[in-house]
Amino acid sequence: TVLHAGGKFGGGGYKVSGGLHGVGASVVNALSEWLEVEVAKDGNIYQMKFARGHITQEMRIIGTTDQHGTKVTFKPDPEMFDTLEYDYETLHTRMREQAFLNAGLHITITDARIGSQDKPEKERFASMCYEGGIREFVSWYNRHKTPLHEQVIYMAGKKGDQTAEVALQYNDSFTETIVSFANDIHTPEGGMHEEGFKRALTNVLNAYGIKKGYLKNDDKLSGDDVREGLTAIISVKLTDAQFEGQTKAKLGNASMRTLVNAIVSDQLA
C-alpha cells in the first residue's frame, strides 16, 4: 500500500530489479476486489489481507515452515474492469521466458478454469526448467529451422555489478532473430545492449574474413549481411536500468553497449 517501495528501493532487497517506480503491488492491490499476501520467513508464515486497497486483516502469524518465499493471491475488481479473463498463452509465454533467462529455475503454471465458455475441457499445466539457460532459448527459437552449426555459441562476462550473456546460432533461413532482455524484461525495441552486440559481431566477422583472405579491406560485410539467418539471445542485468518509457521497450544504459561489445569482441574472435 506504500508507493515507491519494493525490492529496488532502500537497498539490499535485490541485486537487480525490473521495476521503475515501486508501484506494482500497490496498483494491483488498489484494483483488486481482494488481495491476500503470505510470506514465509524466519520459520513463520505471515499473512495480511486487503479489500480494494484497504486492510481487512492486519499481518499475523498463521503457521510455521522451513521454506521461504511469497505468495500473492488476488481477484481483479469487476467494478474496475469490463473483462476479468486471463489469456493462458500470454502468461505461459512470459513464464517460459523467465525459465530460459534464469538457468535452473523451476516454474509451473496451472490453468484450473474448465467447463465454461472458451475454456478447455481439462486443466492446463506446464512445468518449465532449463539448465542450459539462454543456450536452450536459442535452440527453442531454432526448433523449426536447420542450424548451420550444432553447438550454440555462448559468451558471458561482467564488470562491477553489471553482467551480460549472449547466445547465438546460425540457421538456414534468411531472417534475423535477435531477442534482448534487461533484468529479465523483454526489450523489443532493443537499446544499448543490442547496439553493442551488433557492432561487435560485424567487426569480428569482418576481421576474420580479412585475416583468412575471404574479404578485402574495401569489401567488408554489412551488419545486415552478418545477421542473415542469425538467432541470438542477449540478456543483461544491472542495478540501475534506464528504460526509455514506461513500457520498458528499449534500454538506455550506454555502459551495457560497452560491456556487450567487449564480451563478444573478446570471446567470439
Description of each model-found segment:
Residues 5-132, 136, 140:
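GHKL-type ATPase core
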Residues 241-257:
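Short, low-complexity, polybasic intrinsically disordered segments
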